[in-house]
């Protein structure tokens, strides 16, 4: 029970951080985040998710694609599996405690920077997600893009 409560608090807090730091909360956009504890039963189905990491702002540039099949879970789990199964894919994240959760800050050596006003924007079908890797649960056959961009390019200034 304590683990479920911890997961709930982490998910809710990270959702709040994602909304506060995104700077583009859109009340017309449906809530994309899972803020409640998912049921353990029935067993979740396997889903296939394509992860794309794209960086063209600085060298080395890259456009990396990993296709991952796992039981339905949060986006962080799919990133971890991509590292396990695809030797060319690496990421790091910072954990901000149970109140805030995880935030991806580096993919394949390219790091987000508040000084340079760059970050890894997460989107699906051209729509920026309003939550992060701890609370977003991809759908089957979804393509998730991690695009290295600037605050200005993403409309956050």
Residues of each region from the PLM?
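Ubiquitin-like/PB1-type beta-grasp interaction modules and other compact soluble beta-rich domains
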Residues: 2-157
């Amino acid at each position: 029970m304590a683990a479920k409560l911890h997961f709930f608090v982490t998910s809710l807090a990270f959702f709040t951080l994602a909304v506060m730091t995104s700077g583009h909360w859109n009340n017309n956009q449906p809530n994309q985040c899972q803020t409640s504890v998912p049921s353990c039963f029935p067993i979740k189905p396997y889903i296939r998710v394509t992860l794309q990491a794209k960086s063209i702002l600085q060298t080395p540039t890259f456009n990396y694609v990993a296709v991952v099949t796992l039981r339905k879970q949060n986006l962080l789990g799919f990133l971890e599996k991509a590292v396990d199964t695809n030797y060319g894919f690496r990421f790091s994240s910072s954990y901000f405690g149970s109140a805030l959760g995880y935030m991806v800050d580096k993919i394949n050596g390219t790091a987000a920077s508040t000084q340079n006003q760059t970050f890894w924007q997460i989107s699906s079908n051209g729509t920026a997600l309003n939550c992060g890797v701890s609370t977003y649960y991809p759908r089957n056959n979804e393509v998730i893009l991690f695009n290295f961009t600037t605050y200005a390019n993403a409309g956050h200034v």
